[in-house]
Amino acid sequence: MSLKPYATPTYWQRVKVAFQYIFPQLPVTRLAGWLAEQKWGAVTHFIIRTFAKQYKVNLSEAQKSNASDYATFNEFFIRPLKENARPINQDAQALCLPADGKVSESGKIEDDRLLQAKGHFFTLETLLANDQEMANKFKDGHFITTYLSPRDYHRVHMPCDATLRKMIYVPGELFSVNPFLAEHVPNLFARNERVICEFETEFGPMVQILVGATITASMSTVWAGIINPPRTKEVVEYHYETSGETAVHLKKGQEMGAFRLGSTVINLFPKDSVEFEAHLQAGVETRMGERLAKIK
């Protein structure tokens, strides 16, 4: 885990951070979700074309490559890609990256502490909704945090073959999760709304977390559909059988969830279970399916 020097924020940076605390996160997120589901024909197509141009979205790799092919903005945002647009690493001893985006941080979990960004840490226990039993499984393990920008493909995939054990919906704030705010809002990922998914794998437990953000109107999984809305005020746990007809088995590279706008994915691995690719440091671009780590 690389430690970077912490720079004192400028006046305008402090203003930008302060604005996040007074910004009406939930009403704006609800409005964004409603707008993104509207079927406005030519208006919707114009918005999609403008967005794609502004953020340099590569529509040529999508199954629907024309803005006019999408009925709603959300349909465009969670667009599926063409077959083989993201080849999955076929090494049986390799894990693959779960999402397109950039590495926010990665490295070793120091006891129970994860590096959020320059000088900011958060704990496993707070990230995992005070589930101490789950947190203990990942002490001194490894983590990688992937930030998905507006231009990125927003479906999330499995890094390895796995069986679902537990899902936890955690209500929370809806701070933006861009790299600047990750450096300036303490405990950002442990404060924001999130969906925690715990899996069993051949190398032990693994957790994949979908973290919400401002205007992330909803998060979904392939086994449960849209998790939010509705948004509850309490933590909600779902437990799953790991064998039998109702068990949820997912293959490496298989889709497991999606963001309707936003956000961030965090992966946790147990101590001495995997070895990350050396180049996966903060700021490095990621493409779903490429090599993440090898199983020890």
From Swiss-Prot:
The positions making up the signal sequence are: none
One GO cellular-component annotation of the UniProt record comes to: plasma membrane
Paired cysteines (S-S): none
Q: Which GO terms describe its molecular function?
A: phosphatidylserine decarboxylase activity
Residues marked Cleavage (non-hydrolytic) (site): G262, S263
The keyword Ribonucleoprotein is assigned to this record: no
Primary subcellular site in the record, as a coarse category:
membrane
Catalytic machinery residues: D100, H157, S263
Modification type Pyruvic acid (Ser): residues: S263
UniProt PTM: Is synthesized initially as an inactive proenzyme. Formation of the active enzyme involves a self-maturation process in which the active site pyruvoyl group is generated from an internal serine residue via an autocatalytic post-translational modification. Two non-identical subunits are generated from the proenzyme in this reaction, and the pyruvate is formed at the N-terminus of the alpha chain, which is derived from the carboxyl end of the proenzyme.
Location within or outside the cell: Cell membrane
Q: Which residues cross the membrane?
A: none
EC number(s): the record gives 4.1.1.65
Names of the cofactor(s): pyruvate
Q: How is the cofactor bound?
A: Binds 1 pyruvoyl group covalently per subunit.
Q: Which reaction does it catalyse?
A: a 1,2-diacyl-sn-glycero-3-phospho-L-serine + H(+) = a 1,2-diacyl-sn-glycero-3-phosphoethanolamine + CO2
Q: Which biological pathway?
A: Phospholipid metabolism; phosphatidylethanolamine biosynthesis; phosphatidylethanolamine from CDP-diacylglycerol: step 2/2
Q: Which InterPro entries match?
A: PS_Dcarbxylase, PSD-B, PSD_type1_pro
Q: How does it sit in the membrane?
A: Peripheral membrane protein
The entry's keywords: Cell membrane, Decarboxylase, Lipid biosynthesis, Lipid metabolism, Lyase, Membrane, Phospholipid biosynthesis, Phospholipid metabolism, Pyruvate, Zymogen
The similarity annotation says: Belongs to the phosphatidylserine decarboxylase family. PSD-B subfamily. Prokaryotic type I sub-subfamily.
- Xref: HAMAP family: PS_decarb_PSD_B_type1
Assembly description? Heterodimer of a large membrane-associated beta subunit and a small pyruvoyl-containing alpha subunit.
Role this protein plays: Catalyzes the formation of phosphatidylethanolamine (PtdEtn) from phosphatidylserine (PtdSer).
- Please report the name of this protein according to its UniProt entry: Phosphatidylserine decarboxylase proenzyme
